[in-house]
Amino acid sequence: MTGDMNVGLWNDGGHATVNGDVGGTINRPARPEPDRVEPDRAEPAHGVDVLVVTALLEEFEAARDAAGTTWHKHDADGPVPYLTGERAGLRLALARATTMGARSVAPIAAQLALRLRPQCLAMSGVCAGHPDRTAPGDVVVADPAYEYDEGRLTGTGFTGEHRHYPLDTRQLRAVQEFEPAGLPTYGTVGGEESENWFLERLHHGQEPRLHAARPRYVPPGVWPAMVSRLEGDGLIVLRGRRWNLTRAGRLRIERLMAGDVDGPDRLPFAVLAGPMASGSAVVADPGIWDRLAGMGERKVLAVDMEAATIAMVAHDHRIPDWLVVKGVMDGADPAKDDRFKRFAARASAEVLYALLAERRA
């Protein structure tokens, strides 16, 4: 890639601005139409600005459709097919693995990094989020990314040996100041939606009053009337200082969860930067969060299978920047389902492109 491209992609002035109000009304832009994909063409002569790699087909489709561009196929019949397109002045390449995990993602990211010479290696997709620090649909930006199951295993236990890959400081600042209001997947909630969020937290054994997402789902001033209404309807009962579900309340939220097969289209999600721990297996164990804290990462926000690989490939191939953005689809608990998977994949792609555009600006 030429020097002119390097200067044009990332400048020192790129930063995000804070705007919008979670309690206000948002004029949401219409969802873009599914993007066109044109026939195979020659490999880009001058490389690309950003290479986006996903692990799953659903994540790939979300990243493809959220870009709002016309894509061009490359090597459609080869071992590593990919698409190219342009968005916000950035030349993009998009590819996917055929299955989850580092062993599938690493060779694709490495091969295309050598061929396309990107200035940023990125990934969008889904992850598990810490149930007390994130809500389903929230978007986590990895900082740092690390492999949590690297280390030494003996008959008496496991000792971690973690290599951390921190996010660029300027990018971290932009993430911390980023406000997702205005993205197609962002929307406020109220009334019955707030009640359902409250009841679902109780159903999962959480304390809604102390949950980090409470101000977004139950705006200031709404709580007293809401709990009074739910209590009057016989859905909750106060025991000591904590609200508990009654049988009627449990039946209502279980019926709602069982009937919600498509998941949400819009949520008041937050964009959070924090540690993302990558492992080699899908986790359905709520004890994972305490174990990760016991290994020394007390503020871990998310668990996935590929973030550390993306950061490692960027480091080893001397790619100037990397960015892993993933939407929370569950809390790594045994009751996990795919209700939020579609939303999480789409929201993460929208946030990824928005962050890239702001950095480009």
What annotation goes with each model-predicted range?
Residues 31-323, 327-361:
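Intrinsic-disorder/coil detector with helix-boundary
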Residues 1-41:
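Long, low-complexity intrinsically disordered regions enriched in small/polar
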